[in-house]
Amino acid sequence: MKKINDLENLAKSYRRDLFEKFLLIKQGHPGSIFSMMDIVVTMYHGGFVRFDDKKKSFIYKVLISKGHATAALYPILKDFGVLSRKEWNNWGQTESLLRVFGNNSIPGIDITSGSLGHCIGAGSGMAVSYKRTNKDKKVFVIISEGELYEGSTWEALLFAKHNNLNNLTIVIDINSLIILGKTKDCLNLDPIKDKINGLGIKTYEVDGHNLNNLVTTFNESNKSNEVNCILANTIKGKGSSIMENKKNWHYWNQMTEEEIEQTRKELA
């Protein structure tokens, strides 16, 4: 596992690298990607997603249910050698495998996603299979809080609890915004923790941008012998004052030269 300071620097560098890519390809979902960056850096570089160095592949599965933010994994996969540097450099070209929405033809991406509300169900199926075949594998599923509007999400949570899927960890990226605006204004989901606890699922709450607290929380959930759900409170567009907490930065937007330089300085 890397030191906390190293994790923080990696998260910042990945945001910076992705920002430059978005400038180049003029598309993407920076708000949602930046909100979950500290989470995925903790998972991968914190050693919670087991990696086979010889095969250059991950033993544990990670499903990004908020498929529009899958690109958060691209620089991580590149650094682990799962995704080639050539493929990273080709992102935005017609022949590139990399897209705004991830798909499982990309090395290291375990599921094609984008239509919301499906990955807890898919991850639960994987987790059941691993338990029945006695495989020492874990499944992580990252969803957006907006997916709590989907009935399929709650059905899958009930299924996971019923089958005691202690090899499944669900992470909810709570950045308080969806395309339409603030979740509390569109359809208030609070108290999320009480609702999920009410299903009998072990629930943790953490600042999704505090790397030290994230490491502690993932360590605690790792020791648990039941289904885990981590509620990570985040800021949409984290790292850029121009994007933070702004619904219009769900998608990529045009920037002035001054805004570009300001964002570069903030991500430096």
Locations of regions flagged by a protein language model:
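Generic beta-sheet signal
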Residues: 60-62, 137-141, 168, 224-234
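Cofactor-binding active-site loop characterized by glycine-rich and histidine/acidic residues
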Residues: 18-21, 33-162
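Short, active-site-adjacent cap segments at secondary-structure transitions
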Residues: 71, 148-149, 177-178, 236-240
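Short acidic, glycine/serine/threonine-rich loops at helix termini
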Residues: 74-76, 152-154, 180-184, 240-245
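N-terminal hydrophobic or amphipathic helices/low-complexity stretches enriched
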Residues: 1-14
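N-terminal capping segment at the start of a domain
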Residues: 11-27, 173-175
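Thiamine diphosphate
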Residues: 108, 112-222
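Glycine/aspartate-rich loop-and-adjacent alpha/beta segment that forms the canonical ThDP
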Residues: 211, 216-268
